[in-house]
C-alpha cells in the first residue's frame, strides 16, 4: 500500500500516535482543562479527542473551534464546569472528524450532528462515572439541551 492510499482514518491514527494533547494557558485554566480531560478518559473518548484536537488554548475572547489548527480556543468560563467542558471538547473533536472525512453538509447540519455526539458523550459518561455529582451534572445538561431543542 502506498502512502497516498492510507485515507482519513489512517491519517487520524498516524496523527494520534505519540501525540499528547497540549493545554496552553494559566495554571488555573490548565488545571480545569485537565479535570475535564479526566472525565473524557472515564467515558473512553480520550484517544478520539487527541486524534482530532491537538491543542486547547486559553483566550480572552469567545470560545471557538479553529478547525484549520485542530485547536479549541476556550475562555476561562468555558472550563468552569468540567462536565460541560468535557462534552464541548468531544463535540468539537467530532466536528473536526466530519471535516476530515470531507462531509459536504450545511454548516448548521455539521453543528447539529456534532451536538448529537455531545449528548451521546454525556450519556456514556453518566453510565461510566462512579461519581454521583458527575452523574447528576450529566443528567442536568442532557435535560437542559433537550429542553432547548424543543424551543426550536
Language-model segments: which ranges?
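Auxiliary, metal-adjacent structural segments of Zn-dependent hydrolase domains
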Residues: 7-70
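Sec-exported extracytoplasmic/periplasmic mature domains
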Residues: 41-45, 98, 119-126
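Second-shell loop/turn segments in exported
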Residues: 21-28, 79, 101-105
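Active-site recognition of the HExxH zinc-binding catalytic motif
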Residues: 87-100
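Amphipathic alpha-helical coiled-coil segments
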Residues: 145-152
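Charge-rich, solvent-exposed alpha-helical interaction surfaces
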Residues: 32, 36-39, 92, 121, ...
Amino acid at each position: 500500500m502506498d502512502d497516498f492510499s492510507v485515507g482519513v482514518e489512517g491519517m487520524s491514527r498516524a496523527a494520534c500516535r505519540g501525540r499528547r494533547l497540549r493545554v496552553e494557558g494559566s495554571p488555573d485554566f490548565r488545571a480545569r482543562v485537565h479535570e475535564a480531560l479526566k472525565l473524557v478518559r472515564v467515558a473512553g473518548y480520550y484517544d478520539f479527542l487527541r486524534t482530532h484536537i491537538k491543542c486547547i488554548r486559553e483566550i480572552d475572547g469567545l470560545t471557538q473551534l479553529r478547525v484549520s489548527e485542530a485547536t479549541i480556543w476556550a475562555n476561562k468560563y468555558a472550563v468552569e464546569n468540567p462536565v460541560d467542558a468535557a462534552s464541548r471538547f468531544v463535540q468539537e473533536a467530532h466536528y473536526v472528524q466530519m471535516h476530515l472525512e470531507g462531509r459536504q453538509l450545511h454548516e448548521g447540519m455539521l453543528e447539529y450532528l456534532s451536538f448529537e455526539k455531545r449528548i451521546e458523550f454525556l450519556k456514556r459518561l453518566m453510565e461510566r462515572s462512579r461519581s454521583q455529582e458527575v452523574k447528576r451534572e450529566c443528567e442536568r445538561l442532557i435535560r437542559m439541551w433537550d429542553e432547548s431543542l424543543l424551543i426550536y
